[in-house]
Regions:
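Mature extracellular/periplasmic domains of secretome proteins
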Residues: 1-18, 29-48, 58-76, 120, ...
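Positions that flank functional sites
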Residues: 24, 89, 173
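Extracellular S/T/G-rich loop segment that most often corresponds to the catalytic His/Ser-adjacent loop
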Residues: 36-114
Length: 187
């Protein structure tokens, strides 16, 4: 139900960013295929969490969705983020999670739309295809890939990083150059 509501919001013209969830390293032993609603929605941008060294955070949920689609769409730093301390109302505290990575992606989307306010939600999402910046050898050089048995794809997007790390500068540069006649189909 939530996924349908979020997809409807995107269809109405809103660019929506969603957290992938924090189920990979949970106490339940969850692993791959841990992205649930609403992170499994078709149309919004689903965000995984990176550690400061740009490796995927152990807690960040991985795809595939229950119907076999690749998610997340992109990854952003979400570990050890300084945030207001809600408990005391004063000061700051360190927080980690995909819910800390998602606001970073929302900010990147805002900068992208500032550079090109005429972009549709689909065109903003298309910038993911051209704007990813993590280059890595999947399976061959990633010792964690074999141990987590997530069937990581050797192409982008994959079910851990999506299209890779969100790079604000690249997204804004691409937004200014997007040809509205070119699009990528999301299935």
């Amino acid at each position: 139900a939530w996924s349908q509501i979020v997809d409807a919001a995107v269809e109405s013209g809103l660019v929506v960013t969603l957290s992938a969830g924090n189920e990979f390293g949970s106490a339940t032993g969850a692993g791959c295929n841990t992205i649930d609603s609403p992170g499994d929605s078709r149309l919004p941008i689903t965000v995984a969490s990176l550690d400061k060294d740009l490796s995927l955070a152990i807690y960040s949920s991985r795809g595939y969705t229950s119907d076999g689609r690749v998610k997340p769409d992109v990854a952003a730093i979400g570990s050890n983020i300084m945030a207001p301390n809600q408990g005391t109302g004063t000061g700051y505290t360190s927080k980690s999670g995909t819910s800390m990575a998602t606001p970073l992606m929302a900010g990147i989307v805002a900068l992208t739309l500032e550079a090109n306010p005429d972009l549709t939600p689909a065109e903003v999402k298309d910038t993911l295809v051209a704007g990813y910046s993590i280059e890595r050898e999947i399976l061959n050089d990633d010792p964690d890939a074999a141990s987590n048995n997530c069937s990581i794809l050797e192409t982008r997007p994959d079910n851990e990083y999506g299209y890779g790390q969100a790079d604000p500068l690249v997204f804004v540069e691409i937004a200014g150059k997007i040809d509205p006649d070119v699009s990528v189909n999301w299935t």
